[in-house]
Amino acid sequence: MVGTLPAGHTPSHVQSSLPSLPAHLQSDTHLTAHLASRFHVGLPTARLSSHALISLNNYTSSSKGPDGGKEGSAMGETEDLARRAYTRLGARGENQAIVFLGESGAGKTTLRSHLLSSFLSFSSTPLSSKLSYAAFIFDTLTTTKSLTTPTASKAGLFLELQYDASSSVNPTLIGGKIIDHRLERSRIASVPTGERSFHVLYYLLAGTSAAEKAHLGLDSPIHVTTAGGRLSSADHKRWRYLGHPTQLKVGINDADGFQHFKTALRKLEFPRSEIAEICQILAAILHIGQLDFGSGQATLTGAEESGGYSHEGGETVTVVKNKDVLSIIAAFLGLGVGELEASFGYRTKTIHRERVTVMLDPKGARRSADELSRVLYSLLVAYVIENVNQRICAAEDSVANTVSIIDFPGFAQACSTGSTLDQLLNNAACESLYNFCLRSFFDRKADMLEREEVAVPATSYFDNTDAVRGLLKQGNGLLSILDDQTRRGRTDAQFVEAVRRRFENKNPAITAGASGSGNGYGMVSQNARSSFTVKHFAGEVDYSATGLLEENGEVISGDLMNLMKSTRSDFVRELFGQEALQTVAHPKEKTAIMQAQVSSKPLRMPSMARRKTSPASRLTFDATPAEDPYETESQTGSSAKNSSAKRKSGMLMGGMQCAAGQFLSSLDIVNKCLTSGNLNPYFVFCLKPNDRRIANQFDSKCVRTQIQTLGIAEISQRLRNADFSVFLPFAEFLGLAEVGNVVVGSDKEKSEVVLDEKRWPGNEARVGSTGVFLSERCWADLAKVGERVIPSFAAEDDGGDALLHPRTANYADSKVRLLNPSDHSPGAYIYGDESKQASNTSRDFDGRSDAGYSAFNSGDMFHNLETREQMLEKGNEKQMEEVDEVPVSGSRKRWMAIVWLLTFYIPTPAIRYIGRMKRKDIQIAWREKFAINLLIWLACAIAVFIIVGFPSLICPTQHVYSPAELSSHDGKDGHSSYTSIRGLVLDLGEFMDSHYPGIVPDSALKKYAGVDSTALFPVQVSALCLGKDGNVDPKVLLDYKPTNFSGSVTSTSSGDPNSVYHDFRYFRDDYRPDWYAEQMIYLRANYYKGWIGYSSEYLHTLASKSQNVASINGKIYDLTSYIAGGRRIQGREGDDTTGIDTDFMDSLVVDLFQQKAGEDITKYWEDLPLTPKLRVDMMDCLNNLFIVGHVDTRNSTQCQFARYFILAISVLICSVIVFKFFAALQFGKKNVPENLDKFIICQVPAYTEDEESLRRAIDSMARMQYDDKRKLLVVICDGMIIGQGNDRPTPRIVLDILGVPESVDPEPLSFESLGEGMKQHNMGKVYSGLYEVQGHIVPFLVVVKVGKPSEVSRPGNRGKRDSQMVLMRFLNRVHYNLPMSPMELEMHHHIRNIIGVNPTFYEFILQVDADTVVAPDAATRMVSSCLNDTRIIGVCGETSLTNAKTSAVTMIQVYEYYISHNLTKAFESLFGSITCLPGCFTMYRIRSAESGKPLFVSKEIVEAYSEIRVDTLHMKNLLHLGEDRYLTTLLLKHHPKFKTKYNFRAQAYTIAPESWTVFLSQRRRWINSTVHNLVELIPLQQLCGFCCFSMRFVVFIDLISTIIMPVTVAYIVYLIVWLVRDTSTIPWTSFLLLAAIYGLQAIIFIVRRKWEMIGWMIIYILAIPVYSLALPLYSFWHMDDFSWGNTRIITGEKGRKIVISDEGKFDPASIPKKRWEEYQAELWEAQTSRDDRSEISGISYGTKYHPATQSEYGFPGSRPMSQLELPRHMSRMSLAPSEMMSRHMDMELEDVNLPSDDAILSEIRDILRTADLMTVTKKNIKQELERRFGVNLDAKRPYINSATEAVLSGNL
């Protein structure tokens, strides 16, 4: 073609083929200028002959040329390319491949869609539509908006169109295949600024209806904490996984996109329910992004825990703050809310062949959630694409040829999502494709041209082979090294070093930078500059190696896999069961999935790669199976399922390939397909005209850079020299040329003649030795392919199938249109061109009517499916199985009857729906809790009644004042002013304020204070008494002569001058008959204080003095003056006074008072023969005229009883306080105990404590002043867990402290644990050795609970109680000689044979928490107490706080800790009955000193304490809240004759809860466990001993106080209110009681000089409302707050109680057991058969023994163990030497290879008898002894020295 268009005849821009340009225009600059000239006239394309298309993205329209049609447009050129490829496919039977190259934003995806549309338009099958939909679905799931383009592809695409070549004219499209490579998963959780995540997520948010949004939870207000800490509200719809809210509106019609996506799935025959499930998973992914994590305290006790660690403190855990969002995710994933939340809080890793659970902080939980979202999206994409392929892919055997469209994401200079791995793999793919491009143009025909003896001028070009080999070479390329280092568990620094060693001075394309460092536990101290550099064809790129290996592993933790196994969603189960998810099973337990990985390799291979046999010209495999796993598949069958299974199994055996390795394999396959001999490649170079996406702007510098990068000028130059695309043998060539016999000569000569006739240029046609080389143009001309008719189905046929045509285009085309979409394109929504959107009807996509389609698209796709609530309830249900049947005890039945009696009125549905308690056992527990609370409140009410109500009931309150008491209210010395009128006591002081001082001054009134003022108020008799006949003459007067009852001046005289002011009687001028009555009513209403009171005894005294006084109904009446004639008549002047009767009282009444004076005449009064009216009238007269007061019963018998009853209770309480006081003072002076020789075990349970706490605890135990040889330090690590803030698992921290090197790795052995179902089977590792610290050398034993292989989360973790049981059960079996589990046998072996002590020797066990530090003399003092009293079974010491001033919460605990020990425990200790021996610091007696009978580890204790079925409220409170108290209860119950004591001299220091939440949780546990242990203590024998004052009784009284603690605060408040309201009657008894409580306490700490306790006591008193009111009430109500687990009891047939569990049924036979004697015999057999086996197998410690200086134990100097390690002995079964074969025979601590003291003493005497005493030295004697005994006696030096001195001094 060169020279066919002479320059100057036409404009240069008309020339579309760059090689056709003159030679002087072949430079980068001139080619750029030529492209610019074409670009500016609307021709954005050019060609590289027939091989390649160059397209510039004009950012406007890809389908319009200069004249408005598609001629000259990118779309037109791609159609032409497709037509040429299709022609060659049909004419030559070659496979075709079109490879797209170019940067992101250059339009590759758009041109790819045009190309696919063109190919599909050549076929007339409905399959074409399906392939279009398939491509659309792929793009929807894998494309996104980037900074450079709105449709950036983020997955490599190998799209295969499959053809059948049976048609002689045109090949038939029979299928297709989408092979996706490496989706950019990191984008899901990390959306770069200014970009979007994958389009489908935005489609879902915008395209769902209101009903669908409600179901998916997309309509709820969204609150996300932004990076700045601000809350973003629903107004902005801030979705964390969708980037900035502005990305929701960027001109892409997401709503229509969702409808098209659903339609495409329906057209590909996805069921409606499956489409709904897909949408639910997408919604779940969005919601995962919304999860907000925070730190909390684990205040609920789990089903397998027993109160936690760190002295009952709360473990810091990560919690989800927005539980509503969490429930949506759980519903869609078919999981329980609780287990999903818990799964975010930890992650299990495999480190150094050990599974370790890392406790995650909120940031770690966020990363865990992001991992879940990435996994879900990756699996969803894999699932959808695989299902699409199943619907479009043809059978492999029927495929004759294929057209492959290869489009990988453009080269990336930087990793926008922060994923270095994605960037590296993407660039490696670009490098490989570019290298294939270069080889196709420069190298592919070179060999053949040479064989055919055709000379072609060489062309220089940039060769990227170094980079390709460095990156992609199998075995030692960069990706292979990365994969290998990842699988080996190397660090990033080691990887960079490996890269340096491999490429330094060997390959210039790759250089290694600096490296970081790490500790091997995933906690890397990173160096930000750890990196390597690759010189790519597009420029150098620096890749950070930080975190690269972990990212390459792409490990899905076993936690997530284990979680998903429990899903109730069939769709989620299918997602996690597909072939794209590769799993790693434990080598010893195939059902246990250790980890998994989403494959980075496509599930399918190209059809070319799957052929069993191929012609030599076709693709052949030459890679080894190890290098290419696909090779094995291609040879073993075509079934995808079978091949996948084989691929998985191969990986598991040889180690799973990581992302880089899988991607490398898939790239290798792509490369081999492309380089097969039967494939013709085309290339599409896509260029950006500028970097700013400005339409119709051409940036020459930008374009020239791309031309240089892609080597277009060199390719063009090469094509000017050799543009050969087809090689035809002479016969074929001549046949096509239709050369008959006209031309005479050889075939070669004939061919030369034809070429001469055709006048083709030399670079396009050459004759070789056996055939002819032609360009595609020349071949097409020769073969007359232009005469072939290629069908183009551009209109709908009669059948109604909407085959792709220009009007509707197709999905693959429209979806990714970068330029202006064609009119009415269904893809116009992406670019916001709403005027051109197609109407949303089914016929836009498919002519067939799809039943229910319109309802599906416009309505609710979730209609008739499960609601979210149903899914959530289903997810919370567990798959349970029956594991056991349990009988129900009689006491339980009786208790439940009481519970139902107390709670029958609360309906179960209310508990279920309002309380949200679905399970029946939890509902029953709530009823029990409520019933217990009712009983507790009843007890409190009874207590209140006894304190307040009972005295008032027996002795009602009387408002009476004796005359003497009235006299005291005289207004003097601050006293109140009271006076009385006719027995009525009034408040004179109050009255004075309202009196008229102008008439009578206040001073005059004050003299009436304290006296009887009756004489001041004369009465009008006729107004107050109707008399015996109903009428009394007003002239009748009654004289008032006060009786001086008390003998003092207590009344005023009748002649008082002030009485005239109140005298309104008849004879006065101012007659007011009712004045007195009115005034008395007024005074009583306003100033009433009570009545004058006289006792019954005093009334008798008065009667004896001729006083006519008696009482009726408690009121006292005095008729003395009346009977004595104190009546007279006085009228006004002139009145007639004759005939007036002054006896107005009935004679019967008068006689009664005379006869029964001084008595209670109520009965007689009622018996008087009076008419009812007369009786009423007489009573009125008595009440108004003769009443003098009330009977005073305050000193009566019943009132005395009430008073002394309360006093007795007070005395009892005071006596307890006094006893506590004396108990605290009973100890004598501080004595230093002697050295003791008892063997003790010091046990420390460890969970997630930090290294500092563990080291403090361990060191304090080791440094105790107790014989080191007789101490055994036992540390039990509860699970392989990395606590928050730690960099290693807790067991590793412990072992590092003790000096055990990492190379020591014993086999895990089985033992029984406390757990549900199969969790009863646990496994542990046993370590032992010597720990040296500050001159102490202490033997230690470490038990690490590692769990079974099937445990993927928190392996081995079973709780603190289980850690205690490990040692308790072991000692129990030792003492009873019972069969032991393998781990217990190993423990026995270590203690007996390595440490050298028979386990039965140990007599005491000291249990200390991991955050507790013990005093140096603690063990000595405790053992001393136990030796002084052999009946002691447990002894505790005083625990103080080390963090007293950390927070207000700790401050209020200091004094409480001090008093609870020095008063409460000291008092209980008096009676030998401490009810709670704290687990943080207690020593127990293992066995009886005399008989050796097991005590602490007796069968009864061990069986009761190891209770597994903890399914009732009572048992949970006993074993999950207060296991320490319950253990003490068991000791008291089963060993009632033994004592539990307190020794305040034994000191320990612990850490108290520092936050209110943890403090509340701790006290809730303590208080509730106290209540439930009280129930356990009630049936104990000897509860009431002599005089009800035995040890048990007083303790019982003490425990009762726990229940009524709230009453204490109420009583104190009552006293304060009493004191404020009435200072006259102070309850001295109560205040003396309070003073005694705190006064005696003060004496205690003053005597002990604890002066600081004064301040702490004040703080404690201020906190009394917290301790006595808030905590108990909170605790009682939260008695059922548990993590209930999944084991429960249900009612089966006929009322049977059946235990069901989701943990499976435990078979005790699964753990073999043997007695120690049997195990020893096997050890002997193993030793004697050592010659028949490998000496390495089965050895627990794989370390070599280096003899070193012997310690006194016969061990090498112990610390650090990395220098002097434990011996490795030839035992198959353990790490220890056998007793028979080892040189450490009988390694008892006292005589390990050393002579006894007696033998040494005997020899010393012998030496001294013959030695020269003037010259002999102790050193000489020691050396002589060593010579005689033949052993090193350094360990015996102190004894030798002291014995020598003793012999010489004559003491021995």
Curated annotation (Swiss-Prot):
KO phenotype (gene knockout): Severely inhibits hyphal growth in the presence of chitin-binding reagent, Calcofluor white or Congo red. Leads to morphological abnormalities in tip growth and septum formation. Also results in proliferation of intracellular new hyphae, called intrahyphal hyphae.
One record GO biological process: cell tip growth
Catalytic activity, as annotated: [(1->4)-N-acetyl-beta-D-glucosaminyl](n) + UDP-N-acetyl-alpha-D-glucosamine = [(1->4)-N-acetyl-beta-D-glucosaminyl](n+1) + UDP + H(+)
UniProt keyword terms in alphabetical order: Actin-binding, ATP-binding, Cell membrane, Glycoprotein, Glycosyltransferase, Membrane, Motor protein, Myosin, Nucleotide-binding, Transferase, Transmembrane, Transmembrane helix
Residue stretches spanning the membrane: 895-915, 930-950, 1205-1225, 1600-1620, 1626-1646, 1653-1673
Pfam hit, one: Myosin_head
Entry's localization field: Cell membrane; Cell septum; Cell tip
Region annotated Actin-binding, chain positions: 667-691
Upregulation: Expression is increased under low osmotic conditions. An abaA response element (ARE) and two CCAAT sequences, to which the HAP complex binds, are found in the promoter region of csmA. Moreover, consensus sequences that are recognized by Rlmp and Msn2/Msn4, transcription factors known to be involved in the response to osmotic stress, are also present in the promoter.
InterPro entries with a match to the protein in the record: Chitin_synth (IPR004835), Cyt_B5-like_heme/steroid-bd (IPR001199), Cyt_B5-like_heme/steroid_sf (IPR036400), DEK_C (IPR014876), Kinesin_motor_dom_sf (IPR036961), Myosin_head_motor_dom-like (IPR001609), MYSc_Myo17 (IPR036037), Nucleotide-diphossugar_trans (IPR029044)
Signal peptide: none
Effect in UniProt of substituting residue 347 to A: Lowers interactions between the MMD and F-actin
EC code(s) of this entry: 2.4.1.16
Domain Myosin motor: 1-787
Domain Cytochrome b5 heme-binding per the UniProt entry, residue ranges: 958-1017
Domain DEK-C residues, every copy: 1794-1849
Membrane topology classification: Multi-pass membrane protein
GO MF terms held by the record: actin binding; ATP binding; chitin synthase activity; cytoskeletal motor activity
Residue segments, region Disordered: 1-20, 599-646
Predominant subcellular localization, coarse grouping: membrane
Glycan attachment residues as annotated in the record: 58, 642, 840, 1044, 1195, 1428, 1462, 1568
This protein's GO CC annotations: cell periphery; cell septum; hyphal tip; myosin complex; plasma membrane
Top-level taxon of origin: Eukaryota
Subunit structure: Binds F-actin via its N-terminal myosin motor-like domain (MMD). Interacts with kibesin kinA.
Record's function text: Polymerizes chitin, a structural polymer of the cell wall and septum, by transferring the sugar moiety of UDP-GlcNAc to the non-reducing end of the growing chitin polymer. Plays an important role in polarized hyphal cell wall synthesis and maintenance of cell wall integrity. Its role in growth and morphogenesis is particularly important under low osmotic conditions.
Protein name: Chitin synthase csmA
Originating organism: Emericella nidulans (strain FGSC A4 / ATCC 38163 / CBS 112.46 / NRRL 194 / M139)
Source organism phylogeny: Eukaryota, Fungi, Dikarya, Ascomycota, Pezizomycotina
